[in-house]
Amino acid sequence: MSNVQRFGATGDGTTDDTEAIRHAIRDGDGMLHFPPGSYRITESIEINLAESGPLGIDGTSGTARVLMTGPGPAFRLIGTHGGTGDPNSVKGNVYPKQRLPTIKNIEIEGAHAEADGIEMIQTLQSVFEGVLIRRCRHGIRLTKRNRNVLISHCHIYDNTGIGIFLDHVSLHQINIASCHISYNRLGGIRIEGSEIRNLQITGNDIEYNNHAAHKTEPEPTAEIYVDTTEPGSSVNEITIASNTIQATSSPDGCNIRIREAAGGSARQPGLWSITGNIIGSQENNIHLTGCYGVSLSGNCIYSCGSRNLLIEDSRQINIGTNTFRRHTPRMGTGVRIVRSSDVTVTGCSILDEHPDGQPSGASLLELAACKRINVSGCQLLDGTPCGVDATDCSDVSITGCTIHDTREQIQSRHAIRFTGTGQGNLVGMNSIGRTTESTLVLDESAGVTAEGNVLKS
């Protein structure tokens, strides 16, 4: 064990311990141990794994702090792994000297506007456990190429940039679990310009990742932000499960945002499962653009400034057994699907609790320029002006739903409205309550067949 104090580090929070820590890496045994104390550094501690050999960094059960007072990451770990997760692709001295770099039980605090926490380049089987990174720019930055990353039981907190940043990286097999990722100005987990597969985000608390706590001007961001608009980007085979994902509403902000450019990459963002999360309090809670093959099920999604769920230019989206509602009077609820096809909405509850209709004036379920949409077995309650509002849609089926206004003073103008042009639409076997105007508005040009509905008189 290489105790950094035995190599000259003081840990007094004032002395520059940069060279002493480098001395411990250069001449130590690979287990970089920080006893209790505050270790001030002025430059990045860069570790070439091919030269140093297997590396561990330990902060003595969280009692050690590294204070980064210069620009760049406090620790930059550089490997040479150019293969995949396939054992046969691992070459050179990657297994003997580079595998499993582990950083645990240590705090990194930034004291420079461009200070980052940790940067990983071309590593294999990196492990982060019990790490606190705060007041930096970015917390953990993975770039270029990495494989088989584990991030667990970490606090990525109060950073001016991004909490966990997958930045122009080829990365397969990464688990982010049981972490607090909060109050990071430009997003909690953010993916840009990258090729990602097999990412699991599970059991985390991801909150308030926007400008508000930093007292800066608002910028579009999200708790989980995925941008594949850059050519060559693709993000597939992703699980977001059993997290709390919430925020304060901010302009163009989301809890989960997935962006693909119109007519973008050959491989759209897809093969995603978003399941069993608590998601709330943003302008749009979930906003999907250009996605192909996404399952959203079993989530409680609440309190939006615009929509609980906004889907644009997407296909094969399955929305099942979610609960949509507001949480505070000034916020709203609702689902909007635009220019999308092959979407199912099944077993969902959408409730507007505002006595006069939600502030946005939006209907509960809106469909615009869509085709092959199946809505079945849902409850759409207290929608104003409508429960379902469809424009320029074809081959839409709304069956077996309950669409009622349960308020003492009815506010719903219509239960279902189809306008514009379309064909092959079906409204059937629904339970439909009273409204203030025509219960069903089905323009002849919209091509709607209505049959077997039970209308409450």
Language-model regions, residue ranges each:
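Extracellular beta-strand/beta-solenoid scaffold signature
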Residues: 42-47, 69-94, 111-120, 134-142, ...
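N-terminal extracellular ligand-recognition/capping segment immediately after the signal peptide
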Residues: 8, 18, 22, 26-56, ...
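Short, basic, glycine/proline-bearing loop/turn elements
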Residues: 2-11
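C-terminal closing repeat unit and adjoining cap/tail of repeat-based domains
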Residues: 404-406, 422, 429, 435-438
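Parallel beta-helix/beta-solenoid
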Residues: 29-30, 49-52, 54-60, 70, 77-136, 239-246, ...
